[in-house]
Amino acid sequence: MSSNKVILYHANWSLCSQMVRVALYEKNIPFVSKHIKLCDQYPEGENINKKFLEINPLGTVPAIKINDDITCNSEEIIKKLNSITSDSNIDLYTIDNHESSSIIKETTITEGHKFASTIGTIIPVFSAPLIQHMVKKLPIKSILKILFNHPRRDRKYFFVAMYFFNFTKNLPKRLRYRK
């Protein structure tokens, strides 16, 4: 059994966080769960607080701390978890590395990939109505916090625009968020 101290910083709704949690459970690696209240869902916006930005300067989840080493990309986190010896003796990559890498790149929301070029990078298109619904419920104080504190210019402007404008009204009815 591994003697690593593992702390997972994650959000329940985050697809990438869910994938990392599955990997941890599959490998039977004990971990401490630190739920992060994301700025587009909660007024607290813990992912853009100074304390979390010291862990992940991009303000995104998941992030994992294994002993003193921090990794912030879900693809890299899963690779790192797979290298840890555990009592489950499970290999998360049951097919060759090239094929595994190809599947992971197609299905994760990975930084550096062109928007809508993979299944993972198209997901935000479908989740935008739900995100906008949550952003519009935030108090203006939270929107200002996003504007001044979010390290990612693209996300900060996107969330602020969602708050003040209605992007989803032009979507087909089946894609709009329903109460």
PLM regions: where:
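GST-like domain detector, emphasizing the conserved glutathione-binding G-site
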Residues: 1-155
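Alpha-helix-centered segments that form part of catalytic cores
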Residues: 144-179
